[in-house]
Amino acid sequence: MFTQKLGKYIVTNPKQNLVVPEWGGSLSAERSTRTMYLDSEVIPGAFYVECVWFWPTEQKDTSSPEPHTHEWDEVIAFFGTDRNDLHDLGAEIELYIDGEQNLINETFLAFIPAGIVHCPLNILKITKPVFHFAVGQGKKYF
């Protein structure tokens, strides 16, 4: 598709046959769409990046990853899509970091240092589309 020498470093589709362990949670097709996923299996040497759209729904969120740690730093981000107020997340997120509950209803970045227990991460309410982005320095997330 790309003719340039470095075109092999451009990803336009999510990782195929992504295997998620039991502790990793699951994404409901009714409430989310994983649009991109990158790790060292997709491009050798790449680090972990994931992009997911979450859609408004009345469906209860049961997809949260269990509490876990990584040997690398991670950034978890959620972005609101209201053009008139980009800080309005259009959702309420419950994110546990080191056992402490954080209720967040505005666009945010959460830096999770290596070795810190994080999750569960629950979407308690969602009224507008929300874009989720996560990146970590590890070569694979799962």
Which role fits each region the language model picked out?
Residues 73, 81, 114-116:
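Short, flexible loop/turn elements at secondary-structure junctions
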Residues 80-105:
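A short beta-strand-loop-beta hairpin characteristic of the jelly-roll/cupin
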Residues 119, 125-142:
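A short hydrophobic beta-strand segment most commonly corresponding to one strand
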Residues 100-123:
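Conserved metal-binding segment of the jelly-roll/cupin
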Residues 52, 78-80, 96, 133-136:
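Residue-level recognition of well-ordered beta-strand positions that form the cores
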Residues 47, 73-75, 91, 128-129:
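Residues at beta-strand starts and edge strands
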Residues 60-75, 88-90:
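A short beta-loop-beta micro-motif enriched in histidine and acidic residues
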Residues 1-62:
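A short, N-terminal "cap"/entry segment at the start of jelly-roll beta-barrel domains
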